[in-house]
Amino acid sequence: ASDVYKRQIFDCGPKITIEHKFQYLPYYSKNIWPDKIPLFEKSIMEFYNLCSQISISILKQIEISLNYSTNFFADKFNLPMALLRCNYYPKRSKELTDNDFGIAPHTDYGCLTLLFTDGTPGLEVELPSKKWEPVTAKKNEIIINFGDMLEIWSDQKIRATPHKVIGTNKERFSIPFFFNPQYDTIICDEKNLVAGEYLSQRYDETYVHKII
């Protein structure tokens, strides 16, 4: 049987108030907000900006741990391709199977992911031994995943985190924040690999884009 994904999402990206050369790219598209929820946009964008600050501080610590120059990563996020996603995984009413995923096994395509959960189990990560280990986190804790882009950018000194979400008989909420550098950032000098082009290539390999 094919893998089954079951979830509902709400996405938002950066709020750009200046004209720039990337403004018509999908990573910088204008956000669409529900007009019947007071203060929703304000609350979400405050959280979005806080996540950006946390992500930069993590990248600065990675620079130190790898003996990289100051701002090797951190100054490449002036106009980041950053996405905040609200996930809702409904509880399952039928017997679960091995292929019944909230999200099937994968690594994130981008640089850094902060994950906030409601404490409900479901997330698992793959250990170097290839064993899958459940991840538990309290509501006030942050799970950090490294993505494929950071693995390339760090010359494989940092490894991307394989993970999946198992379907459960409980509903589950999570908020991942995907933090990626500015579109034109070179993440591999040898291949002249551009961050935005790399992300677009990965998405095109995975998704079918349809206008309905």
Where are these regions (language model features)?
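Catalytic core of Fe(II)/2-oxoglutarate
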Residues: 72-73, 82, 87-88, 98-100, ...
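Glycine-rich active-site/cofactor-binding loop and its immediate structural neighborhood
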Residues: 8, 21-24
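N-proximal short alpha-helices
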Residues: 24-31, 35, 185
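Short, small-residue-biased leader/transition segments that mark boundaries at the very start
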Residues: 1-5
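Solvent-exposed, charged interface segments at domain starts and junctions
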Residues: 22, 38-45, 169, 212
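Active-site-adjacent structural patch at catalytic or cofactor/ligand-binding sites
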Residues: 12, 25-29, 108, 143-144
